[in-house]
Regions:
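Small-residue-rich transmembrane alpha-helices and their cytosolic helix-loop interfaces
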Residues: 24, 56, 60, 87, ...
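Cytosolic juxtamembrane N-terminal segment immediately preceding the first transmembrane helix
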Residues: 1-23
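Conserved MFS/SLC helix-loop-helix module at the cytosolic interface between two early adjacent transmembrane helices
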Residues: 65-101
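Extracytoplasmic
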Residues: 15-49, 67-70
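Helix-loop-helix hairpin linking two adjacent transmembrane segments in secondary transporters
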Residues: 105, 143-176
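Residue-level signature of mid-helix packing/kink "hotspots" within the transmembrane helices
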Residues: 32, 60-68, 152-153
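Paired small-residue
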Residues: 93, 104-112
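Cytoplasmic helix-loop-helix junction between adjacent transmembrane helices
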Residues: 109-148
């Protein structure tokens, strides 16, 4: 009795999975980048800590709502295309944050970032599910998801270190 050769994953698919993992990293890093900088934002914009924390809350709310729309959009326009556009949108939001002169402008930038970041994880997982053979799906989903786990830690670490060493704007420049 002969065994069927296992389905293999092409180099192009593996490269795409690596890029998607970087995208999921960016999504979670964008979400957590402000955690450690809240006291500095409170000081710079001369507002209370609760008001400065809106940069985290507004991002999370926008992120959660926006995710609902990306599945159908990815099905209609193509997952990778939507991921690419969303990543660029997140970068634009980060760039707006770098040049924010008021808390309101920073809040607007965080909404832009969230609108982009919200697409990255669900569409990356969907793309992997469509592109990878069933017998290797769990491993590839884990590799893709590893990016988001690392992004949680990386975002908090980068936000704190860059804010302390260079200033809060550099944390957003890092996300660009």
């Amino acid at each position: 009795m002969t065994r069927a050769a296992p389905d293999t994953i092409s180099f192009a698919t593996r490269r795409s999975i690596l890029l998607l993992s970087l995208g999921t990293f960016a999504s979670m890093a964008a979400q957590r980048i402000c955690d450690a900088m809240l006291p500095e934002l409170s000081r710079v914009f001369d507002v209370g800590l609760a008001q400065a924390a809106q940069v985290v809350s507004l991002f999370a709310i926008t992120y959660g709502i926006a995710q609902l729309f990306y599945g159908p959009l990815g099905d209609r326009m193509g997952q990778f295309r939507v991921i690419t556009c969303a990543a660029l949108f997140c970068c634009v939001g980060s760039l707006v944050a770098v040049f924010s002169r008021s808390l309101d402008m920073l809040l607007f930038a965080r909404v832009l970032m969230a609108l982009g970041a919200a697409a990255l994880i669900p569409l990356a997982m969907a793309w992997v599910g469509d592109a990878v053979p069933a017998n290797q799906l769990q491993e590839m989903l884990t590799r893709t998801g590893l990016g988001s786990t690392m992004g949680i830690v990386g975002g908090q670490l980068a936000g704190g270190l860059l804010t302390d060493l260079l200033g809060w704007r550099w944390a957003f420049a890092f996300m660009t």
